[in-house]
Amino acid sequence: MLRREKGFTLIELLIVIAIIGILAAIAIPMYKTQTIKAKLTEVTNGMSNVASAVAAYMQEGNGWPTANSQDLVQSSLGVSTKALSRIGSLGVNNGVITAIISANTIDPTVDNKTLVMVPTSNTDGSITWTWSSSDMPPAYVPKR
């Protein structure tokens, strides 16, 4: 009577390992990108707080504010610097908000890079904000 072997052949095991390798090669870079985007959310939320303060300042009839340091942003616009912990440098010039992300806080891909919010006054009195960056990879610049 022939005894039948149970288990996987070497080819089957190699195919499974290859499939796992392909999935890992796709998933790991996507995970890294999403992790960076999640950490950047803290920066964009802090900048959005400043944008709200800039919009309120403008709509009170004061014109576009200018504050060239985080301390001035906090004192003149009333924005807490706790929300700006990952931002190394922050300034507002005629309503345009410019932030430089702190070194060694998120990832070398975005650390020390500049993120800019540019306001546009609409005819109905609302303000539309546009995000941009000259040195940050486009995948990390907010779309909204």
Q: How would you name each of these model-derived features?
A:
Residues 23, 39, 48, 108-109, ...:
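Hydrophobic transmembrane signal anchors and adjacent membrane-proximal interface regions, especially
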Residues 59-144:
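Periplasmic/extracellular, small/polar-rich flexible segments of pilin-like filament-forming proteins
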Residues 6, 32, 37-39, 82, ...:
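Context-gated lysine
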Residues 1-3, 59-60:
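Short alpha-helix boundary/capping motifs
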Residues 2-35, 42, 46, 50:
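N-terminal single-pass transmembrane signal-anchor helix
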Residues 33-75:
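Conserved hydrophobic/amphipathic alpha-helical signal-anchor segments
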